[in-house]
Amino acid sequence: MFSRLTFFFIAGTLLCCQLSKTENALTGPEIVSPGEVGLIADSLDLIRDHIQWAIDSQYIAGGVALVARDGKIAWYEAVGFSDRVKQDSLRKDDIFRIASMTKPITTTAIMQLFEQGKLDTSDPVSKYIPEFANSLVVDSFNEADSSYTTRPASRAVTIHDLLTHTSGLTYSYPGSKSGIIYSKFGVIEGWTKDSVLLADNVRIFARLPLMHDPGVQFTYGTSVDVLGRVVEVVSGQPLDAYIEEHILSPLEMVDTYFYLPAEKYDRLVDVWYTADANPEVYHDDYAVSGAKMYFAGGAGLNSTAMDYFKFANALMMGGIRDNTRILKEETVASMTSNHLDTLHLSDGEQFGYGFSVYTADGSFGRKMGRYSWGGFWQTIFWVDPSRNIVALLMTNARETPKWNELFDGYERIVNQSVKE
């Protein structure tokens, strides 16, 4: 369990072990030649070929890639189509559904409230959402008839558990135990066009049986949607209003929304579905149609490559952009350190607050300290503090059979472009 004192002790220790970023953050996104920031132009140009390979292979319709070093953009291009059927060319300022790349933004909102002393990561969630008191855990599950039994959880779910995806909440993966059980409750995961409030849906989350006791296992899922409701309760603002006032506006993220204004509808890219996908199950027009009243802290935002770069670069700079601070430097340091203790994701890769973090060097040229996250619609970003690199790749596609090859290959190209 992480108290405020423990949190800042860890953060302070981390800061002593790494170079401190200055507060002279980026004044507007400056675009430079790759060589000016120690990157090899010919190597970065392979990004274009890599994205084109994915387009030619029918995996995606197009992509916008952005690579920056030292806060300066060295490669920024759109390749392919925003609508492949209509053959509309993709533009750099087109808007993408970013799904789970919403999670780091909602986590940032939580940590702002933490800094203000309005909540603590060790607090039980029931302090803010009473329905989370006396949580139950699945004890047994009968695959034959989908019946299950429960028992009391070993302890209360905390804010820390939600931040680290160790709460026991998950997603209803098709055919899984969670998928079968969750279907009995009618819970909304991600986005919806229905007239539903976050507060009401989170009450259903609170009734769901946990898949395991809090804190004993990393189980990716809807924890950050619950955190979105905590933001609302603590701040007294709807989640969209809080994020706009305290994150998007200070960072001048002018094209990031839960629901797009009408004048920007034409900039939302079309989702490319491969032959194995069923578009009807995804309701991908949620950003421009429906009730527009559900603010999913774990999956609901839409953004551009440039906007998200502003957010990611502010993190790399220690929580600041243009002398506007959204987080303390020590808070960012702790958020991007491992918080899983003895739990383990994979060799070198662990989880902080809102990000996967590398505690050792990894494949594809990844360095210790790298942190990142991606989204359901095939988007990804990462920050490499050891090289001062921020990179993003935005696409919107589903059932892409080689999405790992797309993203990993992109990262390898970026890392190989660094002049040693």
List each model region and its residues.
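Acidic/histidine-rich, surface-exposed loop or edge segments in extracytoplasmic proteins
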Residues: 25-35
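C-terminal motif of bacterial Sec signal peptides marking the signal peptidase cleavage site
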Residues: 15-16
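Active-site SXXK
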Residues: 51, 71, 96-129, 133-134, ...
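Structured C-terminal helix/loop/strand segments within mature extracytoplasmic catalytic/sensor domains
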Residues: 374-420
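Short, gly/Ser/Thr-rich active-site loops of penicillin-recognizing serine hydrolases
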Residues: 19, 317, 321, 331, ...
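Short, conserved catalytic-motif segment at the N-terminal edge
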Residues: 35-98, 118-120, 137-142, 284-286, ...
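Sec-dependent signal peptide recognition
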Residues: 2-8
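Short, surface-exposed loop or secondary-structure junction motifs
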Residues: 135-368
